[in-house]
Amino acid sequence: MKKYFTIILIVCTCTLSYGQSHFIHNNQTNPSFEDPYSINSVSPYGLELEREIVLLGSGVLLNISGLIVTNNISPLTVQEINELDVNDISSFDRNAIKPHREEVNGDLLLYGSFLLPLTFLANDNTRRDWQMLGVMWLEVMAIQSGINLLIKGLAQRTRPYVYDPNTPLEKKQTVGARLSFYSGHTSTTAATTFYVARVFSDYLSNKTVKTLIWIGAAIYPALTGYLRRDTGNHFRTDVITGYLIGAAIGYFIPEIHMRNEALNLSFYRNFNNESVNISLNYSF
């Protein structure tokens, strides 16, 4: 999971660098252009130094704690594997027990989710706020990765494929074979898709577009979870828990960054009496 987090940092850095140069170029070549799907040019979010330090610091501490816990886990012995009983698994989870398969195991969907924040470049206002959105995404990924790693290390739940007699013994005797709960692939994709969907919902006004974005955000991690269960990597409860935790993190990180108040100012010229009308909206 830590290699995934490293990839996230690299992708995010590339995203932010490109977003800055592209935004400057767009302003210079066409400064009057406005995205018809945007609410307005006022950002719905704000950053506060103390809060960001707490969030990012918490993510780092969670990841360090998770690494310490998982590094102290020992693989299952042959005797422990032989003593595993399928009947100890609830009927709700039992159908996940099957031979381990590497093909179509959700990795591509996981890697693909790291590219989803690049879609912020398609909108003028989200592109303008690339630095702030980048910080928020790092917080989402750091907290999600840390919580997942720590809970995996504490739970030490045996993966479904370990119960299957057709899975090679060497695959069963790895530390990873004891990190079933909860699904990191599912929680990571859910955190990312719900984060992206929440951000666009706060920036866009077109209800149809927002609905389609949310539908995609819900389906993407669900498909990831299905593949993780279907390849013997996770039980159904692993996937459901990962989905809910990841979605909550992706949704509520933007929520706690919402501005407490917004001031919108607009004006237009009345050509009948040559007067200027000013509209002022102040909301909490």
Language-model features and meaning:
Residues 144-162:
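Transmembrane alpha-helix/helix-exit interface in multi-pass inner-membrane proteins
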